[in-house]
Swiss-Prot record:
InterPro entries: ATP-cone_dom, NrdR-like_N, RNR_NrdR-like. Pfam families: ATP-cone, Zn_ribbon_NrdR. A zinc finger (unnamed) spans 3-34. It comes from Hydrogenovibrio crunogenus (strain DSM 25203 / XCL-2) (Thiomicrospira crunogena). The keyword Protein transport does not apply. This is Transcriptional repressor NrdR.
């Protein structure tokens, strides 16, 4: 790696350790020419699948879109922003680990609903009402009854 101070081509690694829960490698380096020290972070370059929308269009996966959907569902609910970030990161990692090139948006919606069911049941019902296009109160009632049954069986 070139030195960011003098642009010399030779640097040596002084120290390496894992960072951000093992997702990155932090390296302390020293320039062989000017003796300046600097830190670099190394991450794997992973490609996320393209999302197949319900109309057949394809778009790149967008963490922020998932985060916005979660924030909207969790609006005025007692859930920390760190919990939202954890859900986004978990879905991101899961999709990366699967290694598929394309994924239907409906599958991402189901992943979000499962995460919300564990995180906050009110937010789950909110999200489900939009995601599944509830038309009347009966649809809400049915979803809540399913949720109550699932909670009792646990």
């Amino acid at each position: 790696m070139h030195c960011p101070f003098c642009n010399a081509p030779d640097t040596k690694v002084i120290d390496s350790r894992l960072a951000t829960e093992g997702a990155q490698v932090r390296r302390r380096r020293e320039c062989m020419s000017c003796a300046e020290r600097f830190t670099t972070y190394e991450t794997a370059e992973l490609t996320l699948p393209r999302v197949i929308k319900s109309d057949g269009n394809r778009e790149r996966f967008d963490d922020d879109k998932i985060r916005r959907g979660l924030i909207k569902a969790l609006e005025k609910r007692p859930v920390a922003s760190e919990a939202i970030d954890q859900v986004v990161n978990r879905i991101h990692k899961q999709l990366t680990a699967e290694g598929v090139r394309e994924i239907p948006s409906s599958q991402i919606g189901e992943l979000l609903m499962e995460a919300l069911k564990e995180l906050d049941q009110v937010a789950y019902v909110r999200f489900a009402s939009v995601y599944r296009s509830f038309q009347d109160v009966n649809a809400f009632r049915e979803e809540i009854e399913k949720l109550v049954k699932a909670t009792k069986s646990q």
